[in-house]
A protein has these predicted regions:
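Well-ordered beta-sheet/strand-loop patches within structured domains
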Residues: 1-401
Length: 401
């Protein structure tokens, strides 16, 4: 790479072409340049809109004139002169609606407390947010460059996306971990899909959620939830009434808790396995009602996806596994494992800026896990060189070479 760059007439272009940077990185980098230019034009920030009652179409107020200036500065409203700048007219309402969509807040065309807060997010804060996500993109560029086909789950956007030949071909809604049980950020290879899956309760969920319910009413709970207990040593099913539940504890519990296949299974009718130390997987769910919520932080860390059977068909990418074939397996009620022809990389990411929208208007997503701040602090921290453990003493200032 270095030799080729030196021989090239355009080193920067050569390196960019060689790296084949992901469109997200390039688009985010361009967005950063655009917002820095805006800051220069606007003297460092957008005009503020003062606090006050909710502004709606038909109202007149000096605050409306300030709202106009704010939306003109960020591009949702043109700067065409109007007879009465203090009148909240239909055109201004459309501009507010556009801003609300871009800011990922409730769309009603009125400027209440939530919209006012979003309007008064400083331009510098948006620049900082872009910088944070540009840094995140750098972390995974090498892995993305090594793959033509992959899945990206953006936790902050509650979406799962399938890429073929580095082009997004499909997207669906996702539910992610609660704010106190955050979905982790990592990469792993999807190996297989299980239809009509069982659910073996992970240790953390067993300790926090399931074991207390078993201790309270083991027979009733296992019956209601279609759960069986399996002895770790023998692999045989154990009658819950035969267990001394008073003595049971997370450290003294020699059983697996397994939920049988069925419509009430926590994993729904399909799970997508990419082995990892976090016990995280993609799966269907028996709580589909939450997909209509805007903020979808409902799981214990795994990723629940909408339209899982379409996802399975697209992931398998095999004419033998069409919709009818998948439905036929589901109808049997029997657990079936289907291996992918090739491992499919899965990237569980956390990006709070989306520059790759269909209309070209970037989206700034809420930092639901409160993760942006730590990265921004690190980016602005003074540079500090940490030598490796086996570095010569002179590198650490303890002598001379």
């Amino acid at each position: 790479l270095v030799a080729g760059a030196i021989a090239s007439d355009d080193i920067q272009q050569y390196i960019s072409d060689a790296l084949n940077l992901h469109p997200y990185y390039e688009s985010t980098k361009a967005l950063l340049a655009e917002y820095r230019q805006r800051a220069a034009v606007e003297g460092g920030g957008y005009p503020a809109v003062p606090a006050g009652p909710t502004l709606r179409k038909g109202m007149q107020s000096p605050r409306v004139a300030q709202l106009r200036k704010r939306l003109q500065a960020s591009g949702q409203l043109d700067d065409q002169a109007v007879d009465n700048p203090q009148l909240f007219d239909a055109k201004l309402e459309r501009a507010v609606t556009q801003f609300q969509r871009e800011a990922e807040i409730g769309v009603d065309g009125a400027v209440g407390a939530g919209t006012l807060a979003a309007l008064n997010v400083s331009l510098q804060s948006r620049i900082d947010q872009i910088r944070v996500n540009l840094e995140r993109a750098r972390w995974i560029l090498r892995d993305l460059q090594a793959s033509d086909d992959f899945v990206i789950v953006n936790i902050a956007d509650f979406t799962a996306m399938l890429y073929r030949d580095r082009e997004q071909v499909w997207e669906t809604r996702a539910q992610v971990g609660r704010t106190y049980r955050k979905s982790p950020i990592f990469t792993a290879d999807m190996k297989y899909i299980v239809f009509n899956p069982t659910w073996t309760v992970p240790p953390g969920i067993l300790k926090r959620d399931i074991l207390p319910k078993l201790k309270a009413d083991a027979v009733g709970y296992t019956t209601k939830q279609n759960i069986k207990l399996v002895d770790n040593k023998t692999g045989k099913e154990v009658d819950p009434s035969s267990i001394d539940w008073a003595a049971a504890s997370p450290r003294n519990f020699p059983y697996q808790v397994v939920q049988r296949p069925g419509p009430d299974n926590a994993l729904g009718q399909a799970k997508f396995i990419f082995p990892n130390p976090h016990y995280v997987l993609l799966h269907d769910t028996n709580h589909r009602e939450h997909f209509d919520d805007k903020v979808r932080t409902f799981s214990s860390g795994c990723i629940r996806i909408d339209y899982p059977m379409e996802f399975a068909r697209r992931v398998l990418d095999d004419p033998d596994w069409n919709d009818a074939a998948i439905q036929g397996v589901l109808d049997t009620g029997q657990t079936k494992t289907v291996y992918l022809n090739e491992p499919l990389p899965v990237f569980i990411l956390y990006w709070t800026v989306d520059p790759l929208t269909a209309d070209g208007v970037p989206r700034f997503l809420p930092d639901v896990y409160d993760r942006d701040g730590k990265i921004f602090t690190a980016l602005d921290a003074p540079f500090r060189f940490v030598p490796p453990d086996d570095a010569p003493a002179w590198i650490e200032g303890q002598g001379s070479p």
